[in-house]
Amino acid sequence: VKKLTSHNIQSGLYISLQSTSTKVLENIKRKNLKINKIGDLNDLAKENSMPLLTDLILGMPGETPQSWIKNIENVFKNDITNMDVYYLQLLVNAPMNVDQKEEYTLETFGAYDYFYETNVETIQKEIEAGVAESIQVIKSSNTMNHDELLDASIFSWFVLGTHCLGLSHLLAHYLHNTNGIKYTDFYLGLMDYLKEHDSNFNTWIDEYGAKDIRILRTYFGNIDIRHH
């Protein structure tokens, strides 16, 4: 990894956590990376001047709103700020789609903009012609309903923007190290403050969710994922 990074082929040491919940990792048969090893990996990355990167997948079987918040807390308290968040996708013939969809009541919708070089007009034409490509993306489960998943998504993108890509991680680290304040408590409190005092922030939340027209906006900007 160090050699790849030195030649700008790889940006750092990447570990795909997906979740830090023991229950979730058991459900997806992936209990092979214990959270207490992340600190060791991060130390190794720092010794070699490499950033540690990871990802979380929202909507996994058995994931709850509470365990999702804990996922983010575990990532941040292990000093990882390079994080991506993805929605769970159910692939054709994958074990989760075949064996676990009914068990965990995994409700999905067809997303047509999870591919490169797509736009709404092109997607609509392809749908009408019957040639559109789509992928099934999580909408709810028996442990996280649609509204809870949407709230978790909003919080995730909030911390990605402020902590991972912004400057608030400096304050969050300070409060955590000096006063023992959880990272997620800090960001939940910051969200509450902005909801009360910043109309632009509330506008962003409304636009992101757009619950009344059942459109879930994601990181693809002006392209909408439509529920079918």
Explain the meaning of each model-derived region.
Residues 1-181:
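A structural motif corresponding to the C-terminal lobe/cap of the Radical SAM core domain
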